[in-house]
């Protein structure tokens, strides 16, 4: 199920010359395909969520409603499993999120590595996922040193940002969404993820394709003070300018 907001024609024009343009256009046109190297064993029962999911059920439900609002997931009655038995249910884990108030914010992560021998991550064919490479973070240090040498009287500042929500636009191919199911038994709800989940072993590479696109476009913008372009560094869903 591709994200209709990603326009292949516009991406082709704006990102001409981007090394991973073909991979980007495939995601925009078809969505993210998940190829398995072996079938995932059929589940005979719902997997229990991590105890953190029960302890912070209100936040788990809040995050799920937010994802549903932005069309990043489908929330259905738990009984749907009876007619769509191939859904793979993934346990939820709830962890603290940065410096936010832990009573009101959290990060929900599907444990796609459970169980050890029959998980989505274990069965994913990693060779089918687009290749993406990341530069060592020492590049940031070198840029800071360069700026300081050229402007010794100035204080060098770094601007960092997390664009995770933008990467959630990488939607899963419709015939693969059944691999990304979640369950909230207390709410009698089954959740089907639409976007490439953060816990999936292929997500970092998919986000690398998207992050590289941001870098490519940013690097090709110039102004009189930056005739050679702007410094930008990305690592998965984090960007540094």
What does each of the following model-derived ranges do?
Residues 44-50, 190-201, 234-241:
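Glycine- and acidic
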Residues 55, 59, 64, 68-208:
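Catalytic-core region of right-hand nucleic acid polymerases
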Residues 1-77:
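Low-complexity, highly charged intrinsically disordered N-terminal segments
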Residues 20-44, 112-123, 180-186, 229-230:
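Short, compositionally biased low-complexity segments
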Residues 9, 49, 66, 156, ...:
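Hydrophobic transmembrane signal anchors and adjacent membrane-proximal interface regions, especially
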């Amino acid at each position: 199920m591709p994200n209709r907001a990603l326009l292949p024609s516009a991406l082709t024009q704006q990102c001409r010359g981007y090394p991973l343009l073909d991979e980007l256009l495939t995601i925009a046109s078809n969505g993210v395909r998940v190829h398995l190297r072996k079938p995932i064993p059929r589940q005979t029962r719902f997997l229990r969520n991590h105890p953190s999911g029960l302890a912070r059920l209100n936040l788990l439900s809040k995050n799920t409603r937010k994802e549903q609002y932005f069309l990043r997931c489908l929330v259905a009655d738990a009984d749907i499993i009876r007619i769509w038995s191939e859904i793979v249910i993934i346990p939820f884990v709830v962890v603290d999120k940065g410096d936010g108030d832990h009573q009101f914010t959290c990060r929900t992560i599907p444990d796609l590595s459970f169980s050890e021998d029959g998980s989505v991550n274990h069965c994913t064919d990693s060779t089918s996922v687009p290749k993406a490479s990341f530069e060592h973070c020492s590049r940031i240090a070198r840029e800071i040193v360069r700026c300081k040498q050229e402007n010794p009287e100035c204080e060098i500042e770094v601007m960092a940002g997390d664009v995770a929500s933008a990467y959630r636009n990488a939607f899963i191919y419709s015939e693969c969404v059944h691999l990304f199911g979640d369950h909230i038994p207390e709410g009698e709800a089954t959740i089907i993820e639409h976007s490439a989940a953060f816990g999936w072993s292929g997500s970092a590479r998919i986000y690398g394709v998207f992050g590289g696109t941001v870098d490519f476009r940013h690097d090709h913008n110039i102004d009189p003070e930056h005739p050679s372009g702007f410094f930008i560094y990305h690592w998965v869903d984090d960007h540094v300018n």
